[in-house]
Amino acid sequence: MLMMVIRIYIHKRLNAKDYNNFYTSIGDFGYTIPGSDAPQYNIESDSEHYLNFGIAHINFNNGTNNQITNPNPEVYTRFYIQMKTPDGQDRIVYEAENANAISFLIRSTYHKPMSGLVGGFRFDPLLGIRVYKDSFVLADELARIQSEFTTVYGNSGINVTENTTNYSVRMYWESAVVVEPGEPSPENPIPWLSNLPNITDGNPENIDGQWGNVTGFNYNPTTKLFNADVIYDGNSYPIRDAVVASNDDSFLTRTEKAYYFTQGGQKFLYLNFSKDIDSFMFKNHYSELKNWVGHALWNLSTGEVNVMEQLKVFQYLKFTEDNELMAYFYIVDTPVDDLISVTSNVAYRYWKPTWFGLGPKEPGPIQNKIITAAQGEFNSIRPTWVKPVYLGSYFAGASGLVIAGSALIKGGSPWFGLGLAGVGILAGGILQYADDNEWLNYDIAQVQKLEPNVNIRSEISEAYFNAYGQMFPSTLGQSLYRISYGQFDQSDLQVISDKSDVITVVFETDGITHTYQKDQIDDTWDGPATEIPLGVDGILPEWALWLITIVIGLFALSNLQKIFDTIKKKPIISIIVVIAILYALTYFNLL
């Protein structure tokens, strides 16, 4: 049985001529269904019944209450408000079922650089730029379905509007439409499933498109049978006695609002655990998403159910020998087919050596670095052995020059010293040039899938157990990833776990891309990189170093004359000592 869809559109009514669109008397203030005695809406100028709020604007600064009455509740069972998006798509911003009336409060604010009102209307008789903002608060007569949305738009000059599609809306009541699925047969054992429409526009990849609206939501926890209607493009498609295969059916009892979509040839129900309009992760732009509390995706084609609440992310971090911060990255209790990207705020500090590396290391200030690791991208890692080697070569070269100079002063041969200097300076120069041009660097994938072998499992199992009170899963497939957060300039680093955050996670499961933001992520940072580095206590305690310093100082004071005589008689040795001190300061990052 197929019934034709019937819609009744609600038109905007003003008490002054609205630039030849439509008008009525002041007694018809607000919104109402046009009657036979009222001027008809100009269908030819806007066949889609969208109402342009910016052409004539009424002063509603203090708000005005309006009510739209259902002309026939037995026929018109759904009420919709749609708004044009910037790309011209139709987007539902409010909907209600089985309502006799819809009440809403509208507040309008108006800003312009010039003053003056004309007849109580926000018309600017002079050319100027103005900005309008309309806020709608809507509810049905029982306050069962409440929502709020805002339109913002600009105007320049008389009767010249900008970005019309950003604030044009339409409102309508819609009648029920039924497309019967037929009876089961050997060729079509689940007729309601094959009867469901293939939607090409509204889905998680195109959130502003038209989704299927799920109404008549009915689940029996005893029989585990689910019934509902999918409303799409003026038709109603029944879901009849769908069997819930999951042992945990709480996702259905928690569902507040549902939508239908198709993707990759499969049919899905998107079951949201809140009915607030800004709580739908897949139907909101992320700048609009505020109150997400969780949802479930029910693949009607396969029966698989994927429940997603606050995303739990476990990271086991450590620094490699080349100061690369890497993490074993695992999303807990959530299937992941493909990790696309991770963006994190890494808080860290550097433990600075003292007393030429002999004393205890001191913690530096906490610094922050925003890092994104993306699939298909690589980090270039500079081997840390290169810098000490070319600094050592330069030291050897400088020492060779000192030896050659000393030999010349004494009348000996300088060739050994010159040879040592040449080799040292040449080797150091070549290594430094290669290092500066990253010739010795190697690439590490920023996101890399891992098979969790015994070594990895034994390494992270204790930290995982401490975080979640359970053993690390034995069958992870490709859900475990190695994340490279890049190379840091210094060693002896510590990641400050309680000040670090995973900001964004993007992954794909069953062909659907999921994006989680900071407030939706419960992240755990663990591993050796989050601990105080080894050896921070130093080789000697601080009191011993002070004692040694005092002894050396007293010895130097008592032998100042001998020291000055040595510098005069043997300047070469003094130069070597100075070079050694400078090298040590550089090596320990004290210069």
Curated annotation (Swiss-Prot):
Topology in membrane: Multi-pass membrane protein
Keyword Transmembrane appears in the UniProt entry: yes
Predominant place of localization: membrane
Subcellular location: Membrane
Keyword tags: Membrane, Transmembrane, Transmembrane helix
Transmembrane segments: 389-409, 411-431, 538-558, 571-591
This protein's record includes keyword Membrane: yes
GO cellular component: membrane
Stated name of the protein: Uncharacterized 66.6 kDa protein
Origin organism lineage: Viruses, Viruses incertae sedis, Plasmaviridae, Plasmavirus
